[in-house]
């Protein structure tokens, strides 16, 4: 069996490359009993039809609830000597959360919209129910993750502190599909941090969540990690921070270990557009948070923005470099020269808006690549602009 977790639509071509390199038939219909079962999961599985022909089945939701059931079914059928791909997929489709595309029939209206979506057998569920793990603290977590022989992007200990989000950004699929917000107990997180650092030898630990600042026991956890990481010379990474919720005290404590850049995600340059997407950030929030960061000794800031959001205008786009320049000016105006930790480095990273299912913007129009690049060029005058180039994925 091969499990592929797909988080972004731009990674679809990687799926085909993986199958091709493994010499597995690309289409599910072309695979035989000796080929592995290709299981899809992750956020993209909530809208599986664009890639349904390449997968044998999809796991809709969070894997902790039904993975054992699914894998035990596969092992038992293999051990019995009665295994066949068709029989296994039929039985797997009865497991809550498992979607087998080949066992459903779609009828369309004349205008191309769906008229009906029905299972081809009576014992197959008509509706797939997403799986939600309501006990993150008690769930199995990889305490000894595999350490690759080569340098990987996620070359660090990843510690999931919570799942879900208390915010409601209208473009964010994760904030919708991972509801309700659930936290992992701080005692369990301390145990995991110690075990994972000892078993991997990584020099960085990252706290994973959609909004790390909103974790209720963040200060206690950070204080513990500082003590642990200081002994091992390990860096602490705090992604997914909201400027309006970021604690200066926590920031200064983390800074004492090892310097790294702070990452903020205003998503839109103008206040008007931030209100449209329900981001909940004002210019004052952003500048106050940046000021506190600079006073705390930081001089590197990454800003993430999204282009192509609904109702976006040229004025909204030009507000992106303007906001970055305002933050940079704040650094030099408020931090005395003798206290500066080098030059202020602000990096703007832009991605393009992709309408996601199960979000308020799911029916919004998506830009084509040329439109996106044209909008990105508006901010090109800013030295450290990074924009995704769609051609590289093809």
Named regions from a protein language model:
Residues 15, 67, 189, 218, ...:
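Aromatic/hydrophobic pocket-lining residues that form the small-molecule binding cavity
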Residues 10, 194-347:
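Conserved SAM/AdoMet-binding glycine-rich loop
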Residues 1, 5-170, 174, 180-181, ...:
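Acidic, low-complexity intrinsically disordered segments
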Residues 19-22, 53-58, 74-76, 176, ...:
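Short secondary-structure boundary/capping segments
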Residues 57-60, 125-129, 147-151, 155-163, ...:
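Hydrophobic alpha-helical scaffolding
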Residues 38-41, 45-48, 67, 157-165, ...:
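Structured alpha-helical segments in the cores of large, soluble enzyme domains
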Residues 1-6, 383-390:
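Conserved small/polar residues in nucleotide/adenosyl-binding loops
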Residues 9-12, 45-48, 66-68, 106-108, ...:
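Flexible loop/turn segments at secondary-structure boundaries
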């Amino acid at each position: 069996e091969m499990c592929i977790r797909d988080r972004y639509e731009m990674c679809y071509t990687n799926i085909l490359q993986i199958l091709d390199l493994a010499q597995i038939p690309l289409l599910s219909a072309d695979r035989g009993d000796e080929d592995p079962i290709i299981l899809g999961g992750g956020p993209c599985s909530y809208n599986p039809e664009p890639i349904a022909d390449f997968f044998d089945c999809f796991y809709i939701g969070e894997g902790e609830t039904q993975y054992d059931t699914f894998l035990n079914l596969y092992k038992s059928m293999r051990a019995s000597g009665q295994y066949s791909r068709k029989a296994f997929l039929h039985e797997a489709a009865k497991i809550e959360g498992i979607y087998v595309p080949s066992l459903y029939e779609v009828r369309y209206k004349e205008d191309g919209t769906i008229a009906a979506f029905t299972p081809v057998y009576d014992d197959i569920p008509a509706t797939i129910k997403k799986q939600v793990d309501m006990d993150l603290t008690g769930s199995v977590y990889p305490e000894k993750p595999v350490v690759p022989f080569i340098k990987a992007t996620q070359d660090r200990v990843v510690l999931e502190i919570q799942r879900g989000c208390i915010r409601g950004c209208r473009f964010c699929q994760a904030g919708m599909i991972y509801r309700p917000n659930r936290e992992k107990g701080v005692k369990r997180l301390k145990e995991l941090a110690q075990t994972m650092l000892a078993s991997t030898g990584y020099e960085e630990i990252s706290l994973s969540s959609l909004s790390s600042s909103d974790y209720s026991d963040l200060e206690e956890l950070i204080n513990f990690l500082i003590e642990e990481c200081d002994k091992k010379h390990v860096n602490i990474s705090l992604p997914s921070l909201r400027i309006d919720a970021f604690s200066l005290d926590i920031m200064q404590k983390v800074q004492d270990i090892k310097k790294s850049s702070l990452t903020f995600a205003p998503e839109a340059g103008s206040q008007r557009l931030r209100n449209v997407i329900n981001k909940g950030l004002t210019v004052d929030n952003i500048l106050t948070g940046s000021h506190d960061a600079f006073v705390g000794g930081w001089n590197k800031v990454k800003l993430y923005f999204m282009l192509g959001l609904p109702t976006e205008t040229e004025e909204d786009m030009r507000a992106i470099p303007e906001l970055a320049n305002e933050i940079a000016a704040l650094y030099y105006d408020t931090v005395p020269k003798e206290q500066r930790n080098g030059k202020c480095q602000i990096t703007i990273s832009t991605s393009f808006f992709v309408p996601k299912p199960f979000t308020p913007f799911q029916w919004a129009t998506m830009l084509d690549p040329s439109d996106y690049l044209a909008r990105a060029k508006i901010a090109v005058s800013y030295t450290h602009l990074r924009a995704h180039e769609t051609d590289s994925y093809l």
